[in-house]
Amino acid sequence: MPDSDEVDLGPGTLLISAPMMQDPNFRRSVVLLCEHNDREGTFGLILNRELDVSLGDVLDEYVTYDPPLYMGGPVQRETLHYLHTREDIPGGVALPGDMTWGGDFEAVQQLAKGGDAAPDNLRFFLGYAGWGPGQLEGELGEEAWIPAPGAAEFVFDTDPDQLWRAILRRMGGEYAVLANFPDDPRMN
């Protein structure tokens, strides 16, 4: 496992929850970090928790584009966030791995109404994962998370139900072994 002092926690980093994590909010989750600094802490979005609601369930104006929503995290679950790979949504925060977080919501609405938006280039989240200053570093020191570089393919092209295992397998070595860790080791 990488030394927590050597880990880059910058935007675009993925956090893969350790197999033994039992917190139901983060168990077998993959979090994309969007913002991290020593003064304010860390902001991220859980990538692999699809909700049983769609965008049209929370925003009436999306009748032609109604993708599933994802739980971005347990903090402020009433807030809407989005990741995309589109160049026609200005104002977002560019993330490594060819992704953008946020941007001009009016442009998003126009794309959705015009039928130009698709789940393979625009994904919506309710809430976010947040850590106070130093909190995430402490959790990394406890080996609760495995950091990895992010890429748009993990957000838009990989089945969310398989994402946790897929990233660990791709990391290879000891991480690939963790991908096969049973959901409940007591049942093994």
Curated annotation (Swiss-Prot):
Q: Which domain of life is it from?
A: Bacteria
GO cellular component: a single term:
cytosol
- Family membership noted in the UniProt record: Belongs to the UPF0301 (AlgH) family.
Q: Which residues form the signal peptide?
A: none
Listed as disulfide-bonded, the cysteine pairs are none
Q: What is the lineage of its organism?
A: Bacteria, Pseudomonadati, Rhodothermota, Rhodothermia, Rhodothermales
Report what the protein is called.
Answer: UPF0301 protein SRU_0495
Q: Name one Pfam family in it.
A: DUF179
- Entry-linked InterPro entries: AlgH-like
